[in-house]
């Protein structure tokens, strides 16, 4: 299961962007190890109260509401348990959203303070990929070009792939204007207790609300594998604060979810982090961070308790490259920065076309208030200096809008002659248009 490198250069110029997109398209052609059986989104994790029973017509949501709740994580709040169907929402925004924000802010601060790009980000125990959806628009700010996600639960992973794909599609326009290189988001089926070389030496590993789902000895083994074998530059993980269950009206000793194997109180979690600091001195491990607070219960700190571990010395894994037990089952592109790239490429193509064309050699039309020329925008797009795979993503009408903007509306759109065209008034010289374009920047 050896895979080609997923990395590409830093976003210094248009050519780097274009080459990155070309490499992304090549990476997306790489065959998967296998394809997951598609899980039913409408039956997605019915144990959470906000996801209604799909057979309950009275409470059934339409597809748009279902997608909305799934995408914005309203349906996967840790405060919603099997035994408390009528419980109110304790957290605004939902606790899952707050955890995602904590990860985003922590990674942003790490990038700022270390001046190191988080080029490869791994999510271990990714579940339904709430975190990936929550931070995808910030990946450019992190300097990320590759996200690797792994989970052992295939239905959850299938749901995650569907929801992430839908999220990327719905937010394509927002992502297109974000600064950053395109991001390859790959998903794997695997047991996080088994280290995989592809997850070694990454810049960041995140594992939120995962360890409590496996027996405590295995949870400790997982964390020790990350800090001692995979050795990311930063490792963030969280688990429920057991003391906070009292806020939800739960009985002493009752776990927040039926599938939790253990839960720690604040003292137990703090002691665990102190033990890790002694065993792995090459990591600086913060005191516990707390996420999610309900008014009136400030004395309990927060619903989730998180650890942040930063590598202090430049060490590399000793895990052999052939150790790749995970199966690659999905990949999706997060097309950051594509609009800026397209704009700059169209600008270069338009300038190149203007330099080479002699407007006066073409007979102007005189059926308007001023003589003018009409040109098919395809003639301009033929001057694009980009691989065909990327050039084909630039819509002709969008290219015309770019040209209108960069010429300060001295060029007009024309769609009534059977093609997508531009109109140039004879009063505007080629030299004037070139200067206007060169003076305008996006």
From Swiss-Prot:
Membrane-spanning residues: none
Keywords in alphabetical order: Cytoplasm, Magnesium, Metal-binding, Methyltransferase, Nucleus, RNA-binding, RNA-mediated gene silencing, S-adenosyl-L-methionine, Transferase
GO cellular component: cytoplasm; nucleoplasm; nucleus; perinuclear region of cytoplasm
Main location: cytoplasm
Enzyme Commission identifier(s): 2.1.1.386
Effect of a null allele: RNAi-mediated knockdown suppresses RNAi-mediated silencing by siR-1, which are 22G-siRNAs (a class of secondary 22 nucleotide siRNAs that possess a triphosphorylated guanine residue at the 5'-end and are formed from 21U-piRNAs and 26G-siRNAs).
Protein name: Small RNA 2'-O-methyltransferase
Native source organism of the sequence: Caenorhabditis elegans
